[in-house]
């Protein structure tokens, strides 16, 4: 932004008493509260077939890479961003996730009893009432830059990587909004399994996930297909 724009905005914020001498005030922090990320949900119920035979005995998020469990990096990034309300949806070898409580006693577990009968929409069903002001993570992601997890969000969004070509799940984006989700594409954005949902969209997702899940074939869906495909008109992500 231009210096003139920055100065004008700072003047407006000062007049509103949100900023004083370049520092945010208590009133400013209160004004930001509706946009604060309040919780994180980790989808961790699946088998992790791509890491067989390691996952025969260990859920994929608990596999250690360079001595650290995969999920630890994600949880630490959330805590660093001030997100302390953390839910883990577990299913396969569920009891093994109890070990996380020694390091992260704030964790709450959500049980997915049908993880081996349905796709990951079944995990979203279990967590559907926690989706407002919430991050949703695939729990088996390694991140190199924890600062990608932000404390404040003004809209719902998906994290993605710009690609000239990919064979993976990706988005087509038009005017900053996802208009298509597909497998493989050119000049697209590759999904990375991290999204954020504001309060309004989180409430809509709660209803739309349930509706989609209960339709014929609904249990075979991926949860993110709900806002991006089946109920796309309800969202602007």
Q: Which positions does each model-derived feature cover?
A:
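Short amphipathic alpha-helical interaction segments
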Residues: 2-12
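Conserved beta-strand segments of alpha/beta enzyme cores
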Residues: 61, 106-108, 236
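Phosphate- and divalent-cation-binding pockets in alpha/beta enzyme and binding domains
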Residues: 50, 73, 96-99, 126, ...
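A short, conserved structural fragment
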Residues: 14-23
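Conserved core of the sugar-phosphate nucleotidyltransferase
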Residues: 145-217
């Amino acid at each position: 932004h231009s210096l003139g724009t920055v100065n004008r905005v700072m003047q407006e914020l000062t007049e509103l008493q949100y900023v004083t001498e370049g520092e945010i005030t208590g009133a400013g922090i209160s004004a930001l509260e509706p946009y604060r990320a309040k919780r994180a949900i980790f989808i961790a119920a699946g088998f992790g077939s791509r890491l067989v035979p390691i996952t025969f005995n260990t859920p994929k998020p608990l596999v250690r890479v360079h001595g650290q469990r995969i999920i630890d990096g994600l949880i630490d990034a959330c805590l660093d961003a001030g997100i302390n309300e953390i839910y883990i949806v577990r299913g396969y070898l569920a009891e093994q996730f109890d070990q996380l409580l020694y390091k992260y006693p704030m964790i709450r577990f959500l049980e997915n009893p049908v993880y081996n009968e349905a796709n990951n929409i079944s995990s979203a069903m279990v967590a559907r009432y926690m989706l407002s002001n919430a991050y949703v993570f695939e729990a088996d992601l390694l991140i190199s830059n924890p600062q990608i997890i932000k404390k404040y969000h003004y809209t719902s969004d998906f994290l993605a990587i710009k690609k000239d070509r990919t064979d993976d799940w990706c988005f087509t984006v038009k005017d900053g909004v996802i208009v298509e989700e597909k497998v493989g594409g050119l000049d697209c954005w590759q999904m990375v399994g991290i999204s954020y949902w504001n309060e309004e969209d989180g409430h809509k997702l709660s209803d739309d996930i349930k509706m989609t899940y209960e339709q014929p074939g609904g249990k075979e869906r991926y949860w993110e297909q709900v806002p991006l495909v089946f109920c796309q008109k309800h969202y602007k992500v």
